[in-house]
From Swiss-Prot:
Homodimer. One of its GO terms (cellular component) is cytoplasm. IMP binds at D14, E15, G16, K17, N39, A40, G41, H42, T130, R144, Q224, T239, R303. The keyword Methyltransferase does not apply. Its EC number is 6.3.4.4. Binds 1 Mg(2+) ion per subunit. GO terms for biological process: 'de novo' AMP biosynthetic process; IMP metabolic process. It is found in: Cytoplasm. This is Adenylosuccinate synthetase. It is an enzyme of class 6 (ligase). It comes from Psychrobacter sp. (strain PRwf-1).
Length: 429
């Protein structure tokens, strides 16, 4: 029988999931996205060539891998078509490899307008969204008024769209004092999207299940990271979807008993983009060093990432939330040359803080407790054998395993798929 592997972020996103998914899809027949939208940014480097994907699963570069976009994804047809064209211009036959659930809610122009108007109105209290309409699209889904991909092919689309635009325009013009969304322009877009995407629509749940029954290896690719989960993250500084392993089942229709291994991707330090609490954040030369050496700029937004020491307490929480089978530690090479390396091993919690919450307010009030380990002078760049790592690097990895009670199964030592140490392959575990 085949194995079903979940790959997801276990920090605040940007952990390097794209490279690892691309690496592991060598053994997979299909890759499925299960949540998020084009606010994700997955960077792949293959033979020195860089590709950035936002919606399409990272397995698209593999000749024999089918890629699925599950119902848990909010789909921007406009962004998808742009991404498809970029890949097709590079001779990637996207239409032969990509299938999309008809139950994906669509991101419409009014969602983007609402997202941007809200962030502007919040001023200094902004959440730090990408402004791409993700949150408002999920709101329409939960409120049971979303236009889904399937609706593009139904006769009542015009009436449904007209009512929705009227509903959202009232808020846009009367409360936010911005321009209304034009119905005719939006309806014409919907007709264009219908024609462009018709051949890609597929019952994703049934297709994945048939592959499973045939004994094929499947992969489920997460976007963002555990600490951005709508339920378990640093609320309200979170995304609008279920980022944890539980989101796989709701976002694809493949039940939890069919998931065999959950891999948590985590950097050897910690980063965060945008607003929100970050207990181990660094504001000194070391933080600047990590940002510079790690090229810490978001693949989607281009925003500089905030950098800090590894937070083992937050990761221990992610291990529990996702029932992680193993960890992939990325960007170990960024720590090369540091005299000492600190690990956040726990928190001092104010007596007044409601410690059970583990939300944004909780993380804002805690003070991290640190443990200091010696750094290493040798380079880890491109190392593919664990025994070749500096002894101090091995000690750092072992200490992380002890603190989070989860094995480090994969270590990434550079951006290329070949710059990797695989201690335990998820498909062989």
């Amino acid at each position: 029988m085949g194995k079903n592997v979940v790959v997801l972020g276990s920090q605040w996103g940007d952990e390097g999931k794209g490279k690892i998914v691309d690496l592991l899809t060598e053994k997979a027949s299909a890759v499925a996205r299960f949540q998020g939208g084009h606010n994700a940014g997955h960077t792949l480097v293959v033979d020195g060539k860089k590709t950035v994907l936002h919606l399409i699963p990272s397995g698209i570069l593999r000749d024999d891998v089918t890629c699925f976009i599950g119902n848990g994804v909010v789909l921007s047809p406009e962004a998808l078509l742009i991404e498809m064209k970029e890949l097709e211009d590079n001779n990637v036959p996207v239409r032969e490899r990509l299938k999309i659930s008809p139950n994906c809610p669509l991101i419409m122009p009014y969602h983007i307008a609402l997202d941007q108007a809200r962030e502007a109105k919040r001023g200094s209290g902004k959440i730090g969204t990408t402004g791409r309409g993700i949150g408002p699209a999920y709101e329409d889904k939960v409120a049971r008024r979303a236009i889904k991909l399937a609706d593009l092919f139904r006769p009542d689309l015009e009436e449904k769209l007209r009512n929705l635009i009227e509903y959202h325009n009232f808020q846009l013009t009367q409360y936010y004092k911005v321009d209304a969304i034009d119905f005719d322009t939006t309806f014409a877009l919907c007709q264009q999207w219908r024609d462009e995407l018709k051949e890609l629509v597929c019952d994703v749940t049934e297709a994945l299940n048939q592959l499973r029954l045939a004994g094929k290896n499947l992969m489920f690719e997460g976007a963002q990271g555990t600490l951005l989960d709508i339920d378990h993250g640093t609320y309200p500084f979170v995304t609008s979807s279920s980022v944890t392993a539980g989101g796989v089942s709701t976002g694809t229709g493949i039940g939890p008993l069919y998931l065999d291994y959950v891999l948590g991707i985590t950097k050897a330090y910690t980063t965060r983009v945008g607003s929100g609490p970050f207990p181990t954040e660094l504001f000194d030369d070391v933080g600047a060093h990590l940002a510079k050496v790690g090229h810490e700029f978001g693949a989607t937004t281009g925003r500089a990432r905030r950098c800090g020491w590894f937070d083992a307490e937050a990761l221990r929480r992610a291990v529990v939330l996702n029932s992680l089978s193993g960890i992939c530690l990325t960007k170990l090479d960024v720590l090369d040359g540091l005299d000492e390396i600190r690990i956040g091993v726990g928190y001092d919690i104010p007596e007044s803080e409601f410690a059970a919450a583990h939300d944004g307010e909780f993380y804002e009030t805690v003070t991290p407790k640190y443990e200091t380990l010696p750094g290493w002078k040798g380079s880890t760049v491109g190392i593919t054998n664990y025994d070749d790592l500096p002894e101090e690097a091995k000690a750092y990895i072992k200490r992380i395993e002890q603190l989070i009670d989860c094995p480090v199964d994969i270590i990434s030592t550079g951006p290329d798929r070949d710059e990797t140490i695989v201690l335990r392959d998820p498909y062989d575990a």
